[in-house]
């Protein structure tokens, strides 16, 4: 169908055109191989925003923030309940940040890091919830991809937070990523290790949420 978005590249072009009103309708998640690469896009745009801010290109920084926000909107469209509310809060925070950035009102990188940590944490919460749902449905490959995406969200949020948070999350991230890869690739796994990975990831996400003042 004309106008439908089927690839990450198509999606990025649509976001470049700021065509957000009907983005959810046109974004076709055909399978996880199309969907999964999208999960790392917000972090890429967050990193670009910090680089643009450092060189005082505030308009470019605002544009990068808005691109990242569009991806969060897509995830909010897939989410339900508390994870959706968490993503919606981050979308609102990022919208305000982009507006402030454009006027030159953002005075330090800490403001960016805080907002980006919140957003990545919200993504981790949402993906972990989806991983649990997929696991319960015995949709094991989907659970694996969601688990890996949740691990990436936690890692990214911890990176923005820095210090003990970054060090504390590293082991859990590695464990969840390894289990997720086994599930996604059809490798050998046990129910105990998957349950342990999901539980440990949930605990680490909650712990980081408390550190950054994010309700979970």
Question: What do these predicted regions represent?
Answer:
Residues 1-216:
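Long, charged/polar, soluble alpha-helical segments
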């Amino acid at each position: 169908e004309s106008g439908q978005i089927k690839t990450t590249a198509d999606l990025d072009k649509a976001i470049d055109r700021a065509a957000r009103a009907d983005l959810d309708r046109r974004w076709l998640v055909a399978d996880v191989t199309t969907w999964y690469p999208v999960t790392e896009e917000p972090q890429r745009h967050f990193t670009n925003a910090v680089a643009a801010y450092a060189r005082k290109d505030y308009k470019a920084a605002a544009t990068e923030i808005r691109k990242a926000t569009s991806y969060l909107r897509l995830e909010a469209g897939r989410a339900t309940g508390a994870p959706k509310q968490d993503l919606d809060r981050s979308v609102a925070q990022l919208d305000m940040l982009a507006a402030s950035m454009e006027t030159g009102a953002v005075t330090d990188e800490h403001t960016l890091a805080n907002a980006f940590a919140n957003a990545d944490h919200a993504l981790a919460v949402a993906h972990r919830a989806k991983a649990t749902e997929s696991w319960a449905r015995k949709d094991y490959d989907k659970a694996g991809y969601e688990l890996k995406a949740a691990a990436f969200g936690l890692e990214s949020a911890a990176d923005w937070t820095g210090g003990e948070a970054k060090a504390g999350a590293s082991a859990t991230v590695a464990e969840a990523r390894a289990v997720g890869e086994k599930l996604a690739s059809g490798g050998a796994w046990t129910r105990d290790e998957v349950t342990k990975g999901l539980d440990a990831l949930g605990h680490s996400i909650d712990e980081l949420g408390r550190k950054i003042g994010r309700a979970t």
